[in-house]
């Protein structure tokens, strides 16, 4: 959510900044609603004061034994007008809130201006793209040939965009989770956190998934209004909702492993085969809560921490700065890490690292006390995948395959697999 004061005082500036995203904000309509709000608030306050004065006069007249009938009738008329204006004011406030909740974040000045992913800017590359002397296979072909990855069975159990893994591939998948957690906790200094995989609407509103992106979520039946979490960013970030932190507590750095559940609305026809786009997948998430002045340095650190996982696994990747037309609605700036997939002969996203600035904090009322001014200020929140586990498995399978369809284990993962160094076709 954007700053209400900024919206009220300079809606045209907001409209200009959001236009960089391709988002049309009707500043004129918003300003008209604001003028109506101010007029109604002044009017209702005036009517409230007038009614209070007249009610007091009725009490005084009654104590003197005077006829208060006409006076009471006038107060009742005032009360009816007041209630009508309160109703109008509530309606205007709701309209303003709907608009405010629909607005995306203002992009940081360093974000490249562009329309879509074609305008994203490559920042750096790491690692050499492997050259194979044989026709490469996709991860799903490799997994099915190994007899350890079964999409048809998953479709029978549930439906499309699910997978059943077993044997060494399932073990490799689990090893990746532990490896990522160990690096982030032991070497990067994150605190591990375990959170619910089911969240309520307030949490989703706080991090910005609601109201705009409900179609991307799995909502549970019943009266609780619960949803399966689409990323552990949601519950982890909401741990500071409606809190006033001390400056000494910042920065907070959490790492969390969780399953994620996404409906993939709008993804019809995209990545229909394999594990690239699933309804259920695992992710190791990094979340930072910082002071405003520290958040962009934190974004660089968070991104580097995610990169280190790819480097330890010796997976070629690149870092891309998303343009204004491609960053997520709540993000002020985002770096994507894209890993090389030989079967597609291209880089594919494996992590998004974002600075949300105060966008989520304002929704969540997540604040801290500034010791220099003693003022209560909004924190900044950041998040990034460190990494998406399924896509990391995909990248290992494809980059570490041999001509026989075997998968060689990266050196960094061998201690997690009891000495297994190859997953072989039987």
UniProtKB/Swiss-Prot annotation:
Keywords: Aminoacyl-tRNA synthetase, ATP-binding, Cytoplasm, Ligase, Nucleotide-binding, Protein biosynthesis. GO terms for biological process: selenocysteine biosynthetic process; seryl-tRNA aminoacylation. Pfam families: Seryl_tRNA_N, tRNA-synt_2b. It comes from the Bacteria. It is an enzyme of class 6 (ligase). GO terms for cellular component: cytoplasm. Consists of two distinct domains, a catalytic core and a N-terminal extension that is involved in tRNA binding. Homodimer. The tRNA molecule binds across the dimer. PANTHER family: SERINE--TRNA LIGASE, SERYL-TRNA SYNTHETASE. Belongs to the class-II aminoacyl-tRNA synthetase family. Type-1 seryl-tRNA synthetase subfamily. This is Serine--tRNA ligase.
